[in-house]
């Protein structure tokens, strides 16, 4: 997610508006460390409407948030990651982190 995890929650309905959320710098640093180490493929998901793609990409670039893919327009509901494992990779490799909105402690949660 972007709002409430990488930037303080923003909205297209009320301030702070999309594109102007305050960066959660420690969370951004933790995510960028994963990206830079090549230990993860970073796919950001958001309920921001597709019409805000340019604004969102500009915001992510301006705030130094590195990622591989951006999925927009998701509903405000549970997001489920499904992944398999097999004899060649016998340990489940999918993980999810749920964190309180606007909390700046992603690094601790990644341990």
What residue ranges belong to the model's regions?
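HAD-like aspartate-dependent phosphatase fold
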Residues: 2-111
């Amino acid at each position: 997610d972007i709002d409430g995890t990488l930037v303080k929650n923003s909205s297209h309905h009320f301030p702070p508006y999309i594109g102007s959320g305050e960066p959660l710098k420690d969370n951004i640093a933790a995510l960028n460390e994963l990206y830079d180490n090549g230990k993860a493929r970073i796919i950001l998901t958001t309920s921001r409407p597709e019409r805000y793609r340019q604004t969102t990409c500009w915001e992510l670039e301006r705030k130094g948030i590195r990622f591989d893919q951006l999925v927009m327009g998701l509903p405000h509901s549970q997001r489920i990651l499904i992944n398999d494992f097999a004899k060649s990779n016998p340990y489940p490799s999918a993980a999810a982190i749920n964190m309180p909105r606007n909390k700046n402690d992603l690094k601790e949660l990644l341990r």
